[in-house]
Amino acid sequence: MTAETLKPFITPTSANDDGFPAKATSTATAQRRTRQLIPLVLGFIGLGLVVAILALTIWQTTRVSHLDKELKSLKRVVDNLQQRLGINYLDEFDEFQKEYENALIDYPKKVDGLTDEEDDDDGDGLDSIADDEDDDVSYSSVDDVGADYEDYTDMLNKLNNAHTGTTPTSETTAEGEGETDSASSASNDDNVFDDFTSYNAHKKKQERKSRSIADVRNEEQNIQGNHTELQEKSSNEATSKESPAPLHHRRRMHSRHRHLLVRKGESLLSARSEDSRPAAHFHLSSRRRHQGSMGYHGDMYIGNDNERNSYQGHFQTRDGVLTVTNTGLYYVYAQICYNNSHDQNGFIVFQGDTPFLQCLNTVPTNMPHKVHTCHTSGLIHLERNERIHLKDIHNDRNAVLREGNNRSYFGIFKV
């Protein structure tokens, strides 16, 4: 047999078993590719997670820094508001409230706890003001008073001697002797003027001292009597001498500019002179419900008129209403110290039934009790028998009202 005859009976090896070797090769290749793709996919997923976490961290850091800046700006705004409202020391205010809360609320009629030393310090303020007006020099020695009066007596004696020397005592006096006498009298007058100048210097020192009202009035009467004597003597010598004229002028200007000082401890009202202007000052000690006109229904404040005799004949007071007996221009002032939890407090000064002055305070804080004062004042022309009274804007507002306190008061004096 030849090859050609055997060719139909021979089949290729790849065609046996339905192509099994080719299928196995493709499956292995696919598995190999799948195994290679799994790490790549996992790597991409991990990289994405890292990028997301990094982005989230950056965003969170930026957000925190922005919030920190906003917090700092808010703190600055709060600090500025505290400075404007004057509440930088809230802790100290809280301590003050804890210390005086019971005294201000539970015992409203208890006398204010001011010691005698504090009262003396208040009186010292008047003396210090008077001393400052006189070049800030204080003279408190009583011996200088006696020395000043001795100098004044010596000056009067010299004036009498000078007047006697200028009066002719003998009809036989020659003209030459007359010229000698006139020259000597002129020299004496010069000495008298120097002595009077030194007396004025001592007198200014004496005016700086604190004296009682009775001593000042007695001294003023003595000076007026001496002033009359000096005026008569200077008028007799005016035609021949030049020194008495300026002496009389200095004396008149000195008496014109005299002013009275108040001794420590005396009331301003009791220390006034006879020609002083009427004045009255009240410490607000109580209140009562009052229904007024014009829609004002607040409580009326009543003052403690312990100085009744000081303004008798000028003012009349009854149930918190002050009546003026003399027509004129008056200065009215008032202050109330509030201690409550309200944000707004205030009062009105009425002229009759018409509001004249108004005071309103706003304290927007979170403190349980807010202690603050409200003060107002002004000028007003009042006719005879016109009335002035003080009334709160609201009802039942807790205020510091006690006998002898210096926080709530009301006053008036004639200008």
From Swiss-Prot:
Compositionally biased region (Basic residues): 247-256
Residue span, THD domain: 278-415
Topological domain ranges for the Extracellular compartment: 59-415
Residues annotated as glycosylated: 226, 339, 406
Disordered: annotated span: 111-143, 159-256
Transmembrane regions: 38-58
Listed Basic and acidic residues bias regions: 209-220
Gene disruption: observed consequences: Reduced resistance to extracellular pathogens. Complete absence of thermal allodynia in mutant larvae exposed to UV radiation. RNAi-mediated knockdown in the adult fat body results in increased survival following S.typhimurium infection, increased levels of diptericin and reduced feeding rate. RNAi-mediated knockdown in gut progenitor cells represses intestinal stem cell proliferation caused by gut damage. RNAi-mediated knockdown in fat body cells mitigates body size reduction in animals fed a low-protein diet.
Cytoplasmic topological segments: 1-37
SUPFAM superfamilies named among the record's database cross-references: TNF-like (SSF49842)
Comp. bias intervals (Acidic residues): 114-137
Tissues/organs with expression: Expressed in the fat body. Expression progressively increases with age in gut progenitor cells. Expressed in tumor associated hemocytes.
Any one GO BP annotation for this protein: positive regulation of programmed cell death
Annotated signal peptide: none
Family, per entry: Belongs to the tumor necrosis factor family.
Protein name: Tumor necrosis factor family member eiger
Organism for this UniProt entry: Drosophila melanogaster
